Amino acid sequence: LTRTGNFTNNSATVTLNSDANEFATIKVGGSATGNITYNRWVNAIGTNEWDLIGSPVDGLSISSFASTNSSPLATGGGSGGNQYAIGYYDNSADDWTNYTTATIGDAGNFDIGKGYQMGTDSGATLAFTGTIATTDQTQAVQDHSGASGRIWNLVANPYPIYLNANTNADGSNNFLTVNGTTTMHDTYVAIYGYDADGSGYSIYNNTTAATYIAPGQAFMVAADNASSGTSVSMTEAMQTTTGGDDFISGDNMENTEVVVKLFNGDNELDSTKLFFDEVLTLGLDPGYDAGHFDDNAPIMTRLVEDDAGYGMAINAMGLDAMENAVIPLVINQSAGQEFRINLF
């Protein structure tokens, strides 16, 4: 749904629906008055299985959200004791905290642009009711890796509409270009989307086909080295009605890439990607190279030139590197453990 002018809802019910694969959208060209309800799909909770979600509407109380969604929202045994399956990430301590029956009343409103962990009993939609954000939004991010924390920050799409993620979605009005190295760490200019089955993070950057961020989808970004912090921006110019799943990629890129997978028996432990394009270098190409989310991942590579000690999940190089470069490979496995490497 696209509204070129102002949006006003005096008393009617305006509802947008989603399921595990598709998300309704609304785009407002002017101001917005009155509430909408976005029924946002959230996966079932399990061992290490959470969805990372942000509110696609503004002005929503966390306690009223928990009350409205008391049936599908996992609680008690599903999320532990007296906890709700709504939590936040504190990167200063690398810690996840769920709201409880004792703390939910003082939780305040959802901070749009901030991500939260959520889970439902068996996979269902949760109702978010509030106003539509019609201006550019920012979310503070900070690097706490110098102390007991981490570089990672959980942010989210604050709009009830998709956002362009990378240059293949839109050449300039996309999340990576707008934020880039001024906000994100040079080695991690990428979007790290959590796989809800608990297997880890998928990485989306400019080596990925056109990618779009679904309404209310949360993801990790790495702040730059400034401990004083900065902010990432989500802008109206990034908005698009194109999209599908939580993170949706278009057709395969017309470039050369190799995926190196590490196996123990038939069990795939992890993988790392080599990407080749004539405009890239053997050193760091921000937005194309991407460090691994886990510093001790089972398999990674290192930059061929100007290696600063980061394990790479995506190593992007020029086309001539396919024949001439020696690419350092890092494997973290216990002594005596059998493994094999396959190229795809």
Would you name each region that the model predicts?
Residues V14-S18, I36, A66, S79, ...:
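Intrinsic disorder/low-complexity signature
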Residues L16-S18, G54-S55, G87-Y89, G119, ...:
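Beta-strand-rich, repetitive solenoid scaffolds
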Residues L16-S18, T25, N35-S55, M238, ...:
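Boundary/junction segments of secreted and surface-exposed precursor proteins
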Residues W41-D58, A147-L163:
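Amphipathic alpha-helical packing elements
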Residues W41-A44, S55-G87:
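Conserved "landmark" site that anchors the functional core of diverse proteins
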